[in-house]
């Protein structure tokens, strides 16, 4: 997203300070959304948390070109894109991988996951610049949104057979039964 700043400030009625504020809100939201993503993953499953995060991040990418006011850009960048990226972040992805691989291969799986994320970031920036130069920032954001949506089918394979939905009351009942 930062690669599109010049295009946004040129084509929209937004200045650099407004965009900086939207990205600052996004940084706070991203950190907070990591916790939300973890809670969603614990209660409903990793695949649902990743699915929701991807949808939010993609919707933010698609909405950015239509933003003309501060509140609109803060919602698109700061809440939707960053919030979605936080919910579907590395912590939830690692949790999903941890449930799918044997314990002896967990280190390798985490390494591959981290390396894949770094490799993606390494290639996405120059490809994004090429797309922006040749086709414009709006097309680049739409490509990013589509790329995010293309990852949605992979969330199906992360579906956990058993999602724990125990409450504290259930845990207390179990403790009482164990004492008896």
Q: What role is predicted for each listed range?
A:
Residues 55-68:
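C-terminal ends and interior cores of transmembrane alpha-helices
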Residues 87-101:
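Intracellular juxtamembrane helix-capping segments at the cytosolic ends
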Residues 27-35, 122:
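Residue-level signature of mid-helix packing/kink "hotspots" within the transmembrane helices
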Residues 113-163:
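Helix-loop-helix hairpin linking two adjacent transmembrane segments in secondary transporters
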Residues 159-178:
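Flexible cytoplasmic inter-helical loops of multi-pass small-molecule transporters
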């Amino acid at each position: 997203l930062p690669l599109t700043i010049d295009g946004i400030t040129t084509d929209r009625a937004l200045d650099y300070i407004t965009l900086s504020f939207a990205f600052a809100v996004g940084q706070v939201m991203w950190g907070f959304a990591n916790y939300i993503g973890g809670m969603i993953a614990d209660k409903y499953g990793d695949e649902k948390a990743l699915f929701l995060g991807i949808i939010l991040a993609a919707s933010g990418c698609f909405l950015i070109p239509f933003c003309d006011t501060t509140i609109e850009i803060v919602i698109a960048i700061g809440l939707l894109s960053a919030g979605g990226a936080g919910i579907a972040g590395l912590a939830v992805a690692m949790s999903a991988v941890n449930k799918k691989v044997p314990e002896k291969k967990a280190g390798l799986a985490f390494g591959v996951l981290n390396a894949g994320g770094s490799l993606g970031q390494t290639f996405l920036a120059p490809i994004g610049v090429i797309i922006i130069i040749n086709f414009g920032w709006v097309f680049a954001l739409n490509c990013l949104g589509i790329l995010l949506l293309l990852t949605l089918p992979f969330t199906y394979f992360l579906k956990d057979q058993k999602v724990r939905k125990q409450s504290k009351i259930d845990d207390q009942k179990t403790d009482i039964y164990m004492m008896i």
